[in-house]
């Protein structure tokens, strides 16, 4: 068994990007081969079919030989046969990152400093820490790398060093990261990412603030390891309820959206409404190759229609209003049977028809 699921080298860097996004009358609709990226944005009201389509995309991805990582905040992902999915409960199983190992393996002081900054940046992801707080965190990380055997986990050692530093800055960091440092969540685990499966990282039972921190940390690990060409076990990352995550420039999610094609990773992002995002965030999300608009709320119909077609928005609004459960108005770089599709089309989820038979699914999501 692998020691940790984060450090693997992809031999030859055989990039396999996401393809399938839905179907029309049994014919698969895919992201166009010449698209600048293979990211997908899914929006729509609760119960409109977003989660089924996301699962549909996940299943098709593993059928193509890809490995999928799903960040499931509330443990409400559709349950599939064990032959398709691998569930890692962070609360029960732990999440095996072993962030300090690269620091310990550093062959020079310069490399060690780089690795310390790398780990501190991961832990600080999305926290808006000040310069003094970052300095305190780096000191704690460096100390922990040298003394981690004194505690049960790496995070406990970092927490202890922050406490021993005293002062408002160190205490502020420790307070801000309390759930991560003292929750026994990032720890050695027997559960690992399994190639060719839908790997569901369940954050169920963890308080909402710590859930968001964990997602930011996971995305930061994925992004930074991609940049160093060390993270190769995941091809597709799926995240629901993205409105809680940072989309600021230099955030992990922003970097993955804008730079990850050359590293061979695809994002599938979902949210109920785009109205909660500011203009800069919408611009970042606008870089996704394909948008799947499921039935929106009444107040969102007009704005979405105008984004899709500023001239003929009334016609688009009527299509959005009449979407049935499982249907999505699909916009972007798409093709069907190898032919590029020019305008918006309505697609359906293949998984919708098969969910009670072929994939042994049981819906525990309350109709998402």
Name these PLM-found stretches.
Residues 50:
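Conserved lysine of the Walker
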């Amino acid at each position: 068994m692998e020691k940790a699921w984060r450090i693997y080298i992809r031999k030859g860097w055989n990039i396999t990007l996401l393809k399938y996004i839905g179907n029309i009358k049994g014919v698969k609709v895919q992201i166009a081969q010449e698209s600048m990226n293979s990211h997908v944005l899914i929006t729509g009201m609760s119960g409109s079919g977003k989660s089924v389509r996301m699962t549909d995309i996940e299943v098709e991805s593993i059928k193509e030989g890809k490995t999928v990582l799903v960040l499931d905040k509330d443990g409400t992902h559709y349950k599939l046969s064990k032959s398709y999915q691998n569930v890692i409960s962070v609360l029960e199983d732990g999440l095996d990152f072993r962030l300090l190992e690269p620091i310990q393996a550093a062959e020079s002081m310069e490399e060690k400093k780089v690795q310390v900054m790398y780990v501190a940046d991961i832990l600080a992801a999305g926290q808006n820490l000040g310069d003094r707080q970052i300095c305190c965190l780096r000191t704690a990380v460096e100390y922990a790398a040298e003394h981690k055997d004194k505690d049960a986990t790496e995070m406990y050692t970092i927490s202890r060093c922050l406490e021993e530093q005293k002062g408002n800055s160190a205490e502020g960091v420790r307070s801000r990261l309390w759930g991560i440092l003292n929750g026994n969540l990032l720890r050695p685990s027997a559960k690992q990412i399994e190639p060719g499966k839908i790997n569901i990282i369940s954050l169920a039972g963890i308080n909402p603030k710590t859930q968001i921190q964990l997602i930011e940390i996971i995305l930061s690990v994925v992004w930074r390891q991609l940049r160093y060409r060390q993270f190769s076990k995941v091809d597709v990352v799926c995240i629901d309820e993205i409105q809680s995550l940072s989309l600021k420039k230099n955030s992990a999610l922003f970097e993955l959206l804008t730079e990850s094609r050359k590293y061979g990773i695809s994002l599938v992002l979902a949210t109920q409404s785009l109205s909660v995002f500011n203009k800069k965030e919408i611009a970042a999300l606008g870089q996704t190759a394909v948008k799947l608009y499921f039935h929106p709320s009444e107040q969102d119909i007009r704005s979405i229609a105008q984004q899709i077609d500023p001239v003929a928005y009334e016609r688009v609004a009527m299509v959005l209003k009449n979407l049935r459960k499982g249907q999505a108005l699909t916009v972007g770089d798409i093709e069907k049977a190898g032919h590029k599709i020019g305008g918006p089309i309505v697609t359906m989820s293949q998984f919708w028809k098969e969910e009670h038979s072929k994939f042994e699914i049981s819906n525990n999501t309350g109709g998402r």
